[in-house]
Amino acid sequence: MNQKKQIKSDNLQQQQQQQQQQQQQQQQQQQQQQQQQQQKQHIKYLNSNFKDVEKNKILVHLIAGSGSKLVESLVMFPLDTIKTRLQFQGDFSRGSIKNRYSGIVNAFKTTIRSEGILSLYRGYIPHTLYVLPASAISFVCYEAIVQEAKKSKKFKNMMFDTSGIKAVKETGEDLRNGGSTSTSSGRFGVLLPIFVMTIARITGSVLRTPFDVVKMRQQVSGSLVNEHVKKTNSTAFNSALKIIKTDGIIGLFKYSYVSLLRDLPFTAIYFSTYEFSRNYQKHLINRGLKSGEKKKKLSSINNLISGSLAGAFGTTLTIPIDVIKTNLQTQDLLPKEKRVFNGVISAFKYIIKNEGFKGLTKGLSTRLIHIVPSAGLSFCAYEYIKKLLL
């Protein structure tokens, strides 16, 4: 009897255990179903807000591009003001007083002492109104070019791998043998964003000119007090109205082609240097990996280095046209008899004659101090914001 009771109790325990296991399994299944439903709802929510993943990416690049530029401009704009003043003060050789600033440090001290620290942000509003949307569009085009270029194997080798010489040789052999690399859909895909970037940059340079003219005149007019340049605390809007009143609406777009001469090569050098540096660093940090090992990703420091190099190369190679641009767009602050520049060639000859070739690099150190960390910070912030959103 005792054995029978024991058997019954054992059976009951087994049944209870089985029931508990079944209940646990049911609970797990219910949890899995709930998780799946939540995932489906989340996907539906994302799809309702972003119907197309590519549109979502474009929005991310727009936000990251404008956000990175906002961070960079807040930190670095004072250096842009100092750079503009140093470049402009060469015009005093046509006035009645000598150069006011002896260098970067002296310019900072003099400006803050005589006008206050906020004067370093004079012209910031017209600058921001342009650079935020322009930066957003530039980064969207840049991402499109990179993604489309990576679809083409040979283009990828030439642009993104360190073994680019071999790819160039192969491409040349294809052409010599009667083949055409342009038939690749990847290369056609690359041409479109490059074309879009070019058109966007041309349009942007023209539209940027009024903001640049107002910004630079505000930057220089506050401190250069002599019989030619009067001190003013006018707003950006009032400065624009004054230009229109004096020179008409075309005064805001004067020498817009000079902006184009600077911006197009700068953009090409800027983004290509950044991408080359990033991919070269990827090659360096992953060259010791064995087959099957996960590739290491670039850190914020790597992005900072790449961005800084891009800014350094772009700035150094385009500084002569930047000096000419500043002089052309600010000389209207002087009386008509003191305006000796009629265009790029005229400005180039005048600067060489009176200041030598060194005059074409005026403000380079300040511009490098401004652009190099600005570019590094901008790309670093861009990659970080993009990582957060994607």
Curated annotation (Swiss-Prot):
Compositional bias (Low complexity): 13-35
Primary localisation category: mitochondrion
GO terms of molecular function: iron ion transmembrane transporter activity
Residue ranges, annotated region (Disordered): 1-35
GO cellular component, one term: mitochondrial inner membrane
Known function: Mitochondrial solute carriers shuttle metabolites, nucleotides, and cofactors through the mitochondrial inner membrane.
Name this protein carries in UniProt: Mitochondrial substrate carrier family protein U
Organism from which the protein derives: Dictyostelium discoideum (Social amoeba)
